[in-house]
């Protein structure tokens, strides 16, 4: 009886730990997605790997799946508030997808080097940038750019982002936000809205290919991560769309910095 009791206690403990880990992973990822258009992969994968001892490939697959719904609900929320550039978003999305494939193919030919901490450090510094040098572009300043020029810029930036994503394997959320705000001169809300719109599709492609190659995920963890990330992304997106630009820059900056630090600390545990 004792052995059985111990086993059931262990199982209960495991369930408890799984729920706690997925809750915080989903919270970090959802806030990052809803506020900053950041990929859930940056937060969820390291947590699943560190605390649930999950296979890294599977962890990334689960993280990308969490991204899909979280990005979709965020894109919907930003779109309803007119903070989404669908036309250029589509142009960018197609070029991102195509060049992600090309990038990952080239990466597979070269000796494998990991760029694990690259995206984390970038997340942190992007956070610092939003606090020190907020994005104060407006819808008006955005409409000054001729449509044709904007379309060509979107294509070029999509190629760059896709190539980096495929090559580094890093989620393009950060890259996209950085490029939309600093290179393309997007207003912050529109940048995040367009970023999550694109990410819905890039994450879907990534998730499907992960499971096609790596097999089915651990279902309870999968469901918990997807649900928690979705809820927090929805909350964050609603807040973000109501916020003043100054506030949003600060909140985005703080969240990115915190996530950068947290994920960086995790990478030491492993």
Task: Map each language-model feature to its residues.
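Hydrophobic, membrane-facing alpha-helical anchors
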Residues: 13-18, 22, 65-76, 170-180
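Transmembrane helix-bundle signature of multi-pass membrane transporters/permeases
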Residues: 30, 60-68, 192-203, 256
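Membrane-interface alpha-helices at helix entry/exit sites of multi-pass transporters
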Residues: 54-62, 87-88, 185-196
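A small-residue-rich subset of transmembrane alpha-helices
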Residues: 66, 194-210, 220-233
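Juxtamembrane transmembrane-helix boundary motif
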Residues: 5-31, 45, 49-51, 56, ...
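Extracellular interaction modules
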Residues: 1-2
